[in-house]
Amino acid sequence: ALIDENVPVVVVAPDDELFEKTVSNMQEVAARGGQIVLVSDANSDKVGCRVATHLSVPSVHPFAAPLVYALPMQLIAYHTATFMGTDVDQPRNLAKSVTVE
């Protein structure tokens, strides 16, 4: 199984028309013991399952939501990479994918 108590699952869940379906998926993850990191503008009490960490973002217009949700996701990626010892300023294989004219 891919999900167990050692696997954090980052969930981006704006409080919109798809929120209930996202909550259903989160409950499946929680039932399998996964650690849920919730990034949402909704109250974590609305989820109905245990959340390891809740990163709260402000409620904004749906057109601005991608910008608001991008910041915590970038910070999660940055801090995960530095924790793992990855040089975030010199990523591996970058020269192979970037061509200079």
Can you name each region flagged by the protein language model?
Residues A1-E101:
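A SIS-like phosphosugar-recognition module
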